[in-house]
Curated annotation (Swiss-Prot):
The gene is ymdB. Coiled coil: none annotated. Disruption phenotype: Deletion of the gene affects the levels of over 800 mRNAs. Deletion mutant overexpresses flagellin and other genes of the sigma-D-dependent motility regulon. In contrast, the two major operons for biofilm formation are not expressed and the mutant is unable to form biofilms. All cells are short and motile. Deletion also results in a significant decrease in intercellular molecular exchange. Mutant displays aberrant developmental patterns and forms smaller colonies. It comes from Bacillus subtilis (strain 168). This is 2',3'-cyclic-nucleotide 2'-phosphodiesterase. Fe cation 1 binds at residues 8, 39-40, 177. Keywords: Cytoplasm, Hydrolase, Iron, Metal-binding. It is an enzyme of class 3 (hydrolase). Homodimer. SUPFAM superfamilies: Metallo-dependent phosphatases.
Length: 264
């Protein structure tokens, strides 16, 4: 099985990159499944129903979220109605939406789980215990289990990767918007990377207008964050899972921008 994952899509620049490059990436890598983190897709924070469908039309089989899940209030009107949108599973019981979904293609089924970290982020239920619960649930249906762990702290992401090694097919980190170079296969066969990176403005600061962010650091005054304009970037990974052993065998980073050209 091959999985293509695209890191945090930020605003319309990120959506434009998805629209342009995801079809090309699917042609090049021929993934069985494509997953996109869409929690920043609407003006940098949250997701609308229109944008959800646009990401699906651009090639996503499932869309994961994070700490900005609820920033666009209209999500309450559609999150329970769309099939392949997952928000962090460790929100409290009774929260709208779901934290796991299953996607099928060519006789294969992939469980997609979304979890959110608790270090330097608003406190939620324990992601480690929730991982135990959902991995056990998913394993009854499929050996292919993908986790998007939306978290701030590198240590927390590493901890979950090691904790689920051999039980999850892949644990990929999102949220910090900067791609890390630690992609690896853990000893028991789980593909891991601390952060996939972001898809959106290249010359901003984590996708936001850099002058605004610099002003915030210099003055410590509240500012209105806006999505940066100009050059763009796309970050992702391609993960290969052996269909015999059900263990990951490869995780390759993807980075497309003016400094890292895409070759079809």
């Amino acid at each position: 099985m091959r999985i293509l994952f695209i890191g945090d899509v930020v605003g319309s620049p990120g959506r434009d990159m998805v629209k342009e490059y995801v079809p090309k990436l699917k042609t090049k890598y021929k993934p069985h499944f494509t997953i996109i983190n869409g929690e920043n897709a609407a003006h940098g924070k949250g997701l609308t129903e229109k944008i959800y469908h646009s990401l699906i039309q651009s090639g996503a089989d499932a869309i994961t979220m994070g700490n900005h899940t609820w920033d666009k209030k209209e999500i309450f009107d559609f999150i329970d109605d769309v099939p392949n949108l997952v928000r962090p599973a460790n929100f409290p019981e009774g929260t709208p939406g779901k934290g796991i979904t299953y996607v099928k293609a060519n006789g294969k089924e992939l469980a997609v789980i979304n979890l959110q970290g608790r270090t330097f982020l608003p406190p939620l239920d324990d992601p480690f215990l929730k991982a135990d619960e959902l991995i056990a649930e998913a394993a009854k249906r499929t050996p292919y289990i993908f986790i998007d762990f939306h978290a701030e702290a590198t240590s927390e992401k590493l901890a979950l990767g090691w904790y689920t090694d051999g039980r999850a097919s892949a644990v990929v980190g999102t949220h910090t918007h900067v791609q890390t170079a630690d992609n690896r296969i853990l000893p028991k066969g789980t593909a891991y990377i601390t952060d996939v990176g972001m898809t959106g403005p290249y010359d901003g600061i984590l996708g936001m207008d850099r002058e605004t962010i610099i002003k915030r650091f210099k003055t410590n005054l509240p500012v209105r964050f806006t999505v940066a304009e100009g050059k763009t970037t796309l970050s992702g990974v391609v993960i290969d899972i052996d269909d015999q052993t059900k263990k990951a065998v490869k995780i390759e980073r993807i980075l497309i921008n003016d400094d890292h050209m895409f070759f079809e």
